């Protein structure tokens, strides 16, 4: 697996690539509703709510344009999970740097 891909749980064991997330929005604003309608018409909408109330809309970049994903998880919860993923990644990278510096020092 590519080391640059970090997945975030957006509910019901559904994961998205944290590196491709552009925005996490509430679904109740008019601009988001319009964007969702256009995304549905263009086949760029994923409903991952499992029939539950949509509590957040995740906008992601892809090679072919934007993808909108509906989640039943609150926006603040998703943002916290993204932050946790970033912290874990930073710690992992720091650990690798320390290992490399120890290897260089032992040579």
UniProtKB/Swiss-Prot annotation:
Domain of life of the organism encoding this protein: Bacteria
Alphabetical UniProt keywords: Plasmid
InterPro entries: RemA-like
Pfam families: RemA-like (PF04025)
Family (UniProt): Belongs to the RemA family.
Name of this chain's protein: Putative regulatory protein BCG9842_A0044
Source species: Bacillus cereus (strain G9842)
Lineage of producing organism: Bacteria, Bacillati, Bacillota, Bacilli, Bacillales
